[in-house]
Amino acid sequence: MNNNAFHFPVLLDAICKLIEDLPVKSDLIYIDSTLGEGVHAKAILEKYDFLSLVGIERDPQILERARQFLSIFEERITYFNDWFDNFFVNYPLNVKANFILVDLGISMFHYKGSKKGFSFLEDEPLDMRLCSSSCKISAAEIVNTYSKYDLEALIYDLSNEHYSRRISKAIVEYRKIKKIETTKELQSIISKVYPFSKVKINPATKTFQALRIYVNDELARLKRSLPFWVENLAKDGILAIITFHSIEDRIVKDFFRSLSCDLYAKISKKPIMPSFDEIKKNKPSRSAKLRVIKKL
């Protein structure tokens, strides 16, 4: 286990400001829908002793890391090993939440320590399942069995990758000779067909994003959860959602726009973005957007 994989909590100052603006500060329920390693939770629980945490995390490996990381707050925490959409659709608590946090980014542990193939920085098995028991198909199965047209649609629809046709064709041609098994193998296939002049990020970045989203059914879980997140807010409760790419951000934006102004209020018209200083300290935060809604 890599104990150095903990990352910085994104947009923490903005999140703390939301908590400080809650009208009542006594015996409040804070639900972290995407607990991960517990970095947001630790910072929040240290600062606000009037909060009790309900932490939801599907990956049992990372949930155990969170338990260890948050052990000094054990009496204030209830853990659920579940997908957040399952939790909220079948809401098990007898009280509404005062603050719900959703961080849709993948934990740095998954990139650096899980060995599940989320990153192409190391040569790992091409899996990408956050939970192997509930995710039916791995990334390796997708790239080795899906048709060229299905791969092209998947990559484009879930990442806006403009070279999805070239990439899908290259994948299908490569697997005629050899099964694609590792992250470096897939990265190499993609890099060879990507126009060099167009490279601003690693050529494999968007394809890996698309595969991860598809394998874990991320967009469907987000869409399913949104109405239940707002339904399970207490009066004056806050729902704060951090997104990291334009597809999920658009889903959140459109849902917030659909809510009745008589029942809910946006905290800010535009998403809250990380400061220049935060991006300097924590480069992965550069694509983060925080959208917030309050229940009236």
UniProtKB/Swiss-Prot annotation:
Cellular component per GO, a single term: cytoplasm
Reactions catalysed: cytidine(1402) in 16S rRNA + S-adenosyl-L-methionine = N(4)-methylcytidine(1402) in 16S rRNA + S-adenosyl-L-homocysteine + H(+)
Localization (cell): Cytoplasm
Molecular functions per Gene Ontology: rRNA (cytosine-N4-)-methyltransferase activity
Record keyword Methyltransferase present: yes
Keyword rRNA processing listed: yes
Alphabetical UniProt keywords: Cytoplasm, Methyltransferase, rRNA processing, S-adenosyl-L-methionine, Transferase
GO biological process: rRNA base methylation
Residues spanning the signal sequence: none
Top class in the EC scheme: transferase
Record-listed S-adenosyl-L-methionine binding positions: G38, V39, H40, E57, F88, D103, H110
EC number: 2.1.1.199
Pfam families assigned to the protein according to its UniProt record, in alphabetical order: Methyltransf_5
Role according to the record: Specifically methylates the N4 position of cytidine in position 1402 (C1402) of 16S rRNA.
Stated family: Belongs to the methyltransferase superfamily. RsmH family.
Matching PANTHER family: 12S RRNA N4-METHYLCYTIDINE METHYLTRANSFERASE (PTHR11265:SF0), S-ADENOSYL-METHYLTRANSFERASE MRAW (PTHR11265)
Protein's name according to its UniProt entry: Ribosomal RNA small subunit methyltransferase H
